[in-house]
Amino acid sequence: MERLAAAITESLIKKADYYIDLHGGDDYEELTPYVYFAGVAKPEIVEASRKMAEQVDVPYMVQSNVSTGGAYNYAASTCDIPAVLLERGCMGTWEREEVDSMRRDVRNILCSIGAYNGIRSHSTYYPLKMDDVRYQCASVNGLWYPVKKPGDIVHQDEYLGEIRDYEGNVKEICRADMDGVILYQVSSLQVVEGGPVITYGNIVREKDERKTRIAQYWTRRSDSFLEQRRAELHSALAGRWMTELKKHLPVSGRFRILR
């Protein structure tokens, strides 16, 4: 195994300019889509990794605070290669939409770094940054009963779930150490001592230059936006939709497009 790892490192990783790792969660985990970017590396490598993460259509991006524990972290910290890890899909299942989203994310990243001349998505994504992530593990063997779902917002000391024994006795209560958003948690009933239970991160409250760009964008559009929307509502396409919708309404019903 060590020889295989060495061969992959020398023949592939060290010859790469960028590193994109695609993950789908373990069979026993449910998660909300998010992306990691390398955070323990030279400043220019961290910044390049972050810019890659900003191309991904997910709600959250997590700045990794370790240099090991993943090939993408090794690539950035040891080989000076900007790196990200995408998490989408979970519990050993997949959907066509998830596959298409992952392909679109990879294409957008490749376009952003100049490695692909294809058509990038016209959308601009704004994943919220997290750099304080808590990985809570079980202190006992038992059965896990969560009360939250991935993507839920939690507050410090909030009850997240409990671990019981086979007789139903509560052996451990899990509470949030801080405010945050649940990224993933164990979806299986059984958990083992020292094994993962739930993970959540705190959204960074920092000045984000992207917010300024958003405000400027909508400021430029504000003067003509209402006029444009009204024109669209009175277009030929809107008229065809009205005709189709009226076919399915009661005869006495009234229907109009609000504007």
Regions found by a protein language model. Name each.
Residues M1-R259:
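Structured catalytic-domain cores with a bias toward divalent-metal coordination
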